[in-house]
């Protein structure tokens, strides 16, 4: 994978993204459902932290994780679930293959 030779290439995008995330987080306080308000607040804190870390990595910061895993010699008996930053069950991998859309999603006129 090529190294990003211009770390400021995404500055404009982050300039739009971070205020957007702040607006969504602020909108959480207007939710009537207390559990929804708490969940959205938590999700936005996690999301903003992820994007700040992405920005640091694009700027040249070193990685914190372990080295890339070596490929498995044998296929696992069951397909693993997708990794998530939080342990919610809303975004697990589908246990079956999904169809792909080919062609335009717009109807012909």
From Swiss-Prot:
Name the Gene Ontology biological process terms: intracellular iron ion homeostasis
* Record keywords: Encapsulin nanocompartment, Iron, Iron storage, Metal-binding
Q: How is it used?
A: The encapsulin and a cargo construct (an encB-encC-encD fusion) can be overexpressed in E.coli and in human HEK293T cells. In HEK293T in the presence of 0.5 M ferrous ammonium sulfate nanocompartments can be detected and used as cell markers. Coexpression of this nanocompartment with a larger nanocompartment from Q.thermotolerans (AC A0A0F5HPP7) allows of expression of different sized iron-rich particles. The encapsulin shell proteins are not seen to mix.
Q: Which residue stretches does the UniProt record annotate as biased composition, category Low complexity?
A: 66-85
**Compartment list:** Encapsulin nanocompartment
User: Which positions are annotated as binding Fe cation 1?
Assistant: 47
GO terms for cellular component: encapsulin nanocompartment
Role = Cargo protein of a type 1 encapsulin nanocompartment. May help nucleate Fe atoms in the interior of the encapsulin nanocompartment. Present in about 47 copies/encapsulin nanocompartment.
The name this protein goes by in its record: Encapsulin nanocompartment cargo protein EncD
- Naturally occurring in which organism (per UniProt): Myxococcus xanthus (strain DK1622)
Upper lineage ranks?
Bacteria, Pseudomonadati, Myxococcota, Myxococcia, Myxococcales
């Amino acid at each position: 994978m090529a190294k990003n030779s211009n770390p400021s290439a995404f500055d404009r995008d982050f300039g739009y993204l971070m205020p957007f995330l702040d607006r969504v987080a602020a909108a959480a306080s207007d939710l009537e459902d207390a559990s929804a308000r708490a969940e959205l607040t938590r999700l936005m804190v996690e999301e903003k932290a992820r994007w700040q870390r992405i920005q640091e990595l694009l700027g040249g910061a070193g990685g914190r994780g372990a080295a890339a895993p070596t490929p498995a010699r044998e296929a696992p008996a069951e397909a693993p679930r997708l990794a998530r930053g939080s342990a919610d069950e809303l975004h697990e991998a589908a246990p079956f293959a999904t169809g792909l859309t080919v062609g335009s999603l717009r109807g012909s006129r």
